């Protein structure tokens, strides 16, 4: 007998009828822990119910939700009365809840608060251990997944604020089995290599189980013992993990972490100019003080005529002059060396020097810098500035 070929819709309808006609699946009592909780504006409640090994999607419609005598919370352990249904369009199944009873606080939340209390009593969260982030870092280490919104957000913010900063990514697992060990390896790598000035631990938002790697005791100790300052940027602003409490600073989002660790180029230039001005004033002050001392000695000599006093004072003046010349020369040499170093830094930060490393700048006919392809249209005339000059180019083809 040849079997009939079914459409996808026919398969889903068949499964739907099987499920809806099953007596057990129409009268289920299921216990588990709430995660991914969402209260819809329609009044419906969406969430997942999970245990150690599995999870299932659930929905409670408004007509049943209004009868709840408590508010559902993330991590809450509950027992639900429900029926299993199939969503025909997607071919997925979910539990349709008629009633929910509270069964206690979720085990993960209990474990989180227990660990937080223990580590707090050990003192590793104390403010006295928090280190200030470097004001002007040169290299920034990021420990997060190789792909995803978190790493994109951090890198985009840092490069927007200061393109001269080096960024080193340590790709790590940030969710699931062995994720905490992977993050620990990243911290050890940066500490052993001594290759960065500050470390960002980053991950996008998620449920408590998705962020659980950052609630690991061994990871907390590794962050505490890190010789390099750390910034925890895990989840959204409302999410808190153990790594937030033990790190030197917590950022509410990965993007905010990028802002915290990257001084703008203008801030760096202003700081260098202020130091240069301070050195000038210090040298001038030293010379003025020395000159005043010499003038006072000369006045004292004029008021004492005896030859031996004059000779004595002349010797003192000569000694002071020699000392002044020595100190002045040493101060000038030191100031000169510092100014040369500052000038070298300024030259490094000079955007025009970037052209010498193979980059170029594209400008429109009004000499405005073009950053995006979307700012151009066909037949536009642009000027491309390179190391040794510039060329004018007509735009013929745009690839986006």
From Swiss-Prot:
Source organism superkingdom: Bacteria
PANTHER family per UniProt: EXODEOXYRIBONUCLEASE 7 LARGE SUBUNIT
Keywords for this protein: Cytoplasm, Exonuclease, Hydrolase, Nuclease
Function: Bidirectionally degrades single-stranded DNA into large acid-insoluble oligonucleotides, which are then degraded further into small acid-soluble oligonucleotides.
Name assigned to this protein: Exodeoxyribonuclease 7 large subunit
Protein's organism: Clostridium perfringens (strain 13 / Type A)
Family note: Belongs to the XseA family.
EC id: 3.1.11.6
GO cellular component: cytoplasm; exodeoxyribonuclease VII complex
Designated gene of the protein: xseA
Pfam families: Exonuc_VII_L, tRNA_anti_2
GO terms for MF: exodeoxyribonuclease VII activity; nucleic acid binding
């Amino acid at each position: 007998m040849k079997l009939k070929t079914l459409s996808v819709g026919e398969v889903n309808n068949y499964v739907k009828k099987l499920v809806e006609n099953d007596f057990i699946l129409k009268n289920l009592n299921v216990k588990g822990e709430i995660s991914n909780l969402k209260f819809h504006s329609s009044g419906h409640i969406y969430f997942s119910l999970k245990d150690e090994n599995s999870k299932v999607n659930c929905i409670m419609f408004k007509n049943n939700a209004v009868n709840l005598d408590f508010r559902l919370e993330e991590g809450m352990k509950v027992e639900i009365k429900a029926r299993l249904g199939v969503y025909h369009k997607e071919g997925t199944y979910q539990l349709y809840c008629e009633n929910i009873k509270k069964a206690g606080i979720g085990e993960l939340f209990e474990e989180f608060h227990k660990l937080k209390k223990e580590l707090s009593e050990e003192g590793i969260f104390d403010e006295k251990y928090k280190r200030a982030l470097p004001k002007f870092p040169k290299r920034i280490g990021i420990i997060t997944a190789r792909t995803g919104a978190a790493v994109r957000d951090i890198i985009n913010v840092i490069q927007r604020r200061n393109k001269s900063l080096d960024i080193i990514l340590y790709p790590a697992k940030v969710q699931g089995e062995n994720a905490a060990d992977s993050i620990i390896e990243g911290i050890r790598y940066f500490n052993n290599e001594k290759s960065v000035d500050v470390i960002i631990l980053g991950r996008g938002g998620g449920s408590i189980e998705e962020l659980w790697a950052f609630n690991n005791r061994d990871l907390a100790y590794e962050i505490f013992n890190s010789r390099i300052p750390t910034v925890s940027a895990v989840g959204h602003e409302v999410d808190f993990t153990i790594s937030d409490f033990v790190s030197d600073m917590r950022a509410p989002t990965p993007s905010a972490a990028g802002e915290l660790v990257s001084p703008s180029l203008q801030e760096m230039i202003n700081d260098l100019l202020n130091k240069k001005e301070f050195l000038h004033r210090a040298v001038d002050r030293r010379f003025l003080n020395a000159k005043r001392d010499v003038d006072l000695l000369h006045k004292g000599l004029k008021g004492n005529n005896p030859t031996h006093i004059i000779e004595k004072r002349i010797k003192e003046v000569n000694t002071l002059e020699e000392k002044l010349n020595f100190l002045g020369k040493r101060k000038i040499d030191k100031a000169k060396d510092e100014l040369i170093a500052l000038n070298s830094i300024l030259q490094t930060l000079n955007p025009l020097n970037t052209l010498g490393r193979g980059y170029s700048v594209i400008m429109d006919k009004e000499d405005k810098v073009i950053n995006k392809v979307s700012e151009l249209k066909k037949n536009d005339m642009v000027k491309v500035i390179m190391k040794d000059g510039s060329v004018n180019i007509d735009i013929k083809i745009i690839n986006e």
